[in-house]
Amino acid sequence: MSKIKLLMIVFLFAGCSVPDFMIQGQLDDFEIALEAEDVNWIMDQYTDDVVRELPDGFKFKGKDEVRMYWEDLFQSVDNIDVEAIDFVTSGFPPAKLALHWRWKADVVAKAKYFKFDTVGTTIKIEGMDLTYGSGFKTARVITFWNTLDMLQQAGYKVTK
């Protein structure tokens, strides 16, 4: 059986389009890299002039700054479990990707790029990444999560 016929059969049984199938594979690889704390693999997915924005006003420009963010994050958490819940893309190769994700990790040290101390807790959050691509690389990521929920899990009391 030819490879093309085999791919068509796989896509039909998978119930998704070719781009969705390819994106899901890339997201699976990204989950594996996050859980393995593989900074080099993650950095290979970015353009040289990547911009990454986090809640609370943190903005990283270029691979060097983004690498520092990932290294700091991986030094501050253990037992990472991440899951891509859903996504939608635009274009092929994808010019835009909206990703809904779930993250769980044990916080073992204070992160440089998070304003609050949550050391000693296990944080479970859901968030959203808006990703803009350039070819098959990521050029910009804007991340959203609920900081208030994270702080409440860490035992902070929120008052007016």
Task: List the model feature ranges, each with a label.
Residues 45, 49-61, 73-77:
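A short gly/proline-enriched turn/hairpin at secondary-structure junctions
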Residues 24, 28-32:
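Amphipathic alpha-helical repeat scaffolds
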Residues 17-22, 53, 67, 71-160:
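A beta-strand edge to alpha-helix "cap/lid" segment located at domain peripheries
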Residues 10-17:
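Hydrophobic h-region of N-terminal signal peptides that target proteins for export
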Residues 26, 36-53:
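Short, well-ordered alpha-helical segments enriched in acidic and aromatic residues
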Residues 2-9:
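Sec-dependent signal peptide recognition
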Residues 20-23, 35, 59, 63:
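Solvent-exposed, acidic/flexible segments
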